[in-house]
Swiss-Prot record:
Tissue occurrence: Expressed in leaves and stems.
Domain notes: The Asp-Asp-Xaa-Xaa-Asp/Glu (DDXXD/E) motif is important for the catalytic activity, presumably through binding to Mg(2+).
Classification via Gene3D superfamilies: Farnesyl Diphosphate Synthase, Terpene synthase, N-terminal domain
Alphabetized SUPFAM superfamilies for the sequence: Terpenoid cyclases/Protein prenyltransferases, Terpenoid synthases
Domain of life: Eukaryota
Pfam families in alphabetical order: Terpene_synth (PF01397), Terpene_synth_C (PF03936)
Amino-acid positions noted as binding (2E,6E)-farnesyl diphosphate in the UniProt annotation, renumbered to this chain: R264, D301, D305, R442, D445
Upper classification of the organism: Eukaryota, Viridiplantae, Streptophyta, Embryophyta, Tracheophyta
Residues binding Mg(2+) 3, per UniProt: D445, E453
GO molecular function terms listed in the Swiss-Prot or TrEMBL record: magnesium ion binding; terpene synthase activity
Protein name (Swiss-Prot/TrEMBL): Sesquiterpene synthase TPS1
Presence of the UniProt keyword Transferase in the record: no
Pathway: Secondary metabolite biosynthesis; terpenoid biosynthesis
Family of this protein: Belongs to the terpene synthase family. Tpsa subfamily.
C-alpha cells in the first residue's frame, strides 16, 4: 500500500477578523424625501455662491478658500463641473501671477487640478539672503498653508524643499508651546494632524471625518456648506454600509475559515482600502468589483507566500495564465476552490461590462492579474532555491508584486462613460505614475514588515538586499528608503501635471492607492496586525455618523 507523504507547508498564523459578522446585515432605511430635498437646496446655494464669485475678481481669493473647504469636507463630487470651471478660470485669468489672497492655497488647488503653476511665486516669502521673512513666521495659518502646498513639489523645486523644511520646523515649535504663538487648541490640534500626515497624503474620506469638526469650530464657517457636508457624509455612509454588507455576504458564502483557513480574513480592512481609492457615490459598482479583486489578490499572495508548495504553485500559475475552466482538474482541491472564485468573479463583471460594449475593461484587469501571479511565482522560485537577488533584480519583480500595477487598471473597470481603452493600455505598460506608487507601496511595506518575514522562509526584502550590497546598517537603509518614498511622491506629482493623455480622475486612482499605503503601512502592517488606528478609522467611516 502506497504511503501518502505529508506536505510541509510554510504556514503563517493570522489572527481572525476582529469584526466578525458585524457588517454582514445592513438594515436599509428608505431615504427621507425631506432630507433629499434639503440636500438639493443646499447644493444649489453653494453652486450659486461659486458662480457669483467667479465673475468678481475681488471674490477670487474667497472662491479658492470655498473650493478648498468643499474638497476637504468631502463633497467636491457634488460640484465637479463648477470646481473645474472655477479653477480653470483662475488659471486663465492669472496664469502664474496670482494676485489674490493665500499664495499657498492657490498653488495647492491648481496643482491638484493638474495645472503646472510655477513655484517661483514663493520667492516673495524670502529675504535677499535666502532666509524666510519674519512676517511668515508670525502668520501661523500662513505657515500651515505653505507646509501643505509644499507637498505638491516635483524634483528640483528647491524653494519648496526649503519651504517644507522651514515650515515643518516652525510648526513643530508651535505645537510644543501653542500659547506663546497665540495658537488656540483647535488650531494646535489641526497642526499636529498636518505634521502627522499632510492633506496631499491623506485618504479623502478620512479627511472628511477630521475636517468637519475643525471647520465647525471656525467662526467664519459657511452654515449651508457644513450642513450639506454632514448630510452627504451620512448618506454616503449608508451606501458604503450597504456595499460592505453585500461584500461580506459574498465572502462568507465561501466559508473562508473552512476552505481558506490560511488566508488573512481582512475583508472589512480591504473594503476600507478601496474606499481610499474612491468613496464617491458614482463609483459604487467599481468599488465592489475592486474589493473582490483585492480580496482575491490577498488570497493569491497568502497562497504563494504562506501555504502553497512549489510544484503546486507552478501548476497554479500556468492555470491563471491560461485562464480556462479546463485547467481546474490539474489543481489540488484547495486551489480548485480559489481558481473557481477567480474565474467566476471576473466572469461576472465581464458579463456586466459586455452589456455596455466594454468587456475589454475586464480583459485588461485579467491581464494585470496574470502578470501579478507570474511575479509571485518568481518570488516563490527564489524562496524555494534560497536565491538572494540583487536589488535591481528584486525591484523588477517586487514593484509588480506590490500590487499597484494590477490594482490601477482594475480600479478603472466600470468607472463610467469617460473611461476609454487607452488608459487600460497605458496602465499595463507600468508607466512612471504607477511605478512611483509601487515604489511607495513596496518600500513602506518592506520597512515595516521585513523583520517579521525574516523569521520564516521568505524571499529577502529590499531592505536586506540594500544592506548586503552596500554593507550599511539597517537604520541607514531606513533613512535612505524614506527619502526614496518622498522622491516617488515628487515623481507622482510630476506625472499628475504632465501626463496629459490620461484623465485626471484616473490618475487620482493611483495617487489614492499611494495614500492608502501611507495610511495603512506607516507604523505597522495593519492588514496582518489590525491596530487601534485602522480600527478607529473603520469605525469613523462605517459606524459613527455625523450629528446634524
Amino acid at each position: 500500500m502506497e504511503v501518502k507523504q505529508e506536505v510541509l507547508r510554510p504556514v503563517s498564523n493570522f489572527k481572525p477578523s476582529i469584526w466578525g459578522d458585524q457588517f454582514l446585515v445592513y438594515d436599509e432605511k428608505e431615504e427621507d424625501a425631506t432630507v433629499a430635498q434639503l440636500i438639493e437646496c443646499l447644493k444649489e446655494e453653494v453652486r450659486k455662491e461659486i458662480m457669483v464669485a467667479l465673475d468678481d475678481r475681488n471674490k477670487h481669493a474667497n472662491l479658492l478658500k470655498l473650493v478648498s473647504d468643499i474638497q476637504r469636507l468631502g463633497i467636491s463630487y457634488c460640484f465637479k463641473q463648477e470646481i473645474e470651471q472655477a479653477l480653470g478660470h483662475i488659471y486663465d485669468v492669472y496664469g502664474d501671477e496670482w494676485e489674490g489672497g493665500s499664495l499657498s492655497i492657490w498653488f495647492r488647488l491648481l496643482r491638484q487640478q493638474g495645472f503646472f503653476v510655477s513655484c517661483d511665486i514663493f520667492k516673495k516669502y524670502k529675504n535677499n539672503d535666502g532666509t524666510f521673512k519674519d512676517s511668515l513666521t508670525r502668520n501661523v495659518e500662513g505657515m500651515l498653508e505653505l507646509y501643505e502646498a509644499a507637498y505638491l513639489r516635483v524634483r528640483g523645486e528647491v524653494i519648496l524643499d526649503d519651504a517644507l523644511a522651514f515650515t515643518k520646523g516652525q510648526l513643530e515649535k508651535i505645537t510644543k508651546d501653542p500659547l506663546q504663538w497665540n495658537c488656540n487648541l483647535s488650531l494646535s490640534k489641526h497642526i499636529k494632524e498636518a505634521l502627522e500626515r499632510p492633506i496631499w497624503k491623506r485618504l479623502p474620506r478620512l479627511e472628511v471625518v477630521r475636517y468637519i469638526p475643525f471647520y465647525e469650530q471656525q467662526d467664519s464657517h459657511n452654515e449651508s456648506l457644513l450642513r450639506l457636508a454632514k448630510l452627504e457624509f451620512n448618506r454616503l455612509q449608508s451606501l458604503h454600509k450597504r456595499e460592505l454588507s453585500q461584500l461580506s455576504k459574498w465572502w462568507k458564502d465561501f466559508e473562508p475559515t473552512k476552505n481558506l483557513h490560511y488566508v488573512r480574513d481582512r475583508l472589512v480592512e480591504l473594503y476600507f482600502w478601496v474606499l481610499g481609492v474612491y468613496f464617491e457615490p458614482q463609483y459604487s459598482r467599481s468599488r465592489i468589483f475592486l474589493t473582490k479583486v483585492i480580496k482575491i489578490a490577498t488570497v493569491l499572495d497568502d497562497t504563494y507566500d504562506n501555504y502553497g508548495v512549489y510544484d503546486e504553485l507552478e501548476i497554479f500559475t500556468d492555470a491563471i495564465d491560461r485562464w480556462s475552466i479546463t485547467c481546474i482538474d490539474a489543481l489540488p482541491d484547495y486551489m480548485k476552490f480559489i481558481y473557481k472564485i477567480l474565474l467566476d468573479t471576473y466572469g461576472e463583471m465581464e458579463e456586466i461590462m459586455a452589456s455596455e460594449g466594454k468587456a475589454y475593461q475586464v480583459y485588461y484587469a485579467k491581464e494585470a492579474l496574470k502578470e501579478l501571479s507570474r511575479n509571485y511565482m518568481i518570488e516563490a522560485k527564489w524562496t524555494n532555491e534560497g536565491y538572494e537577488p540583487t536589488l535591481k533584480e528584486h525591484e523588477t519583480v517586487s514593484f509588480i508584486t506590490a500590487g499597484y500595477q494590477m490594482l490601477t487598471p482594475s480600479s478603472f473597470v466600470g468607472m463610467g462613460e469617460t473611461v476609454t481603452e487607452e488608459p487600460f493600455k497605458w496602465a499595463l505598460t507600468f508607466p512612471p505614475l504607477i511605478k512611483s506608487a509601487s515604489v511607495v507601496s513596496r518600500i513602506m511595506d518592506d520597512i515595516i514588515g521585513h523583520k517579521e518575514e525574516g523569521k520564516r522562509k521568505h524571499v529577502v526584502s529590499t531592505v536586506e538586499c540594500y544592506m548586503k550590497e552596500h554593507d550599511v546598517t539597517e537604520e541607514y537603509v531606513y533613512d535612505l528608503f524614506k527619502e526614496r518614498v518622498e522622491d516617488a511622491w515628487k515623481d507622482m506629482n510630476l506625472e499628475l501635471l504632465t501626463c496629459e493623455n490620461i484623465p485626471l480622475a484616473l490618475k487620482m486612482r493611483t495617487i489614492n492607492l499611494a495614500r492608502v499605503i501611507e495610511s495603512i503601512y506607516k507604523y505597522d502592517d495593519n492588514l496582518k496586525n489590525v491596530g487601534a488606528e485602522i480600527q478607529d478609522n473603520i469605525k469613523s467611516c462605517f459606524i459613527i455618523s455625523m450629528s446634524i
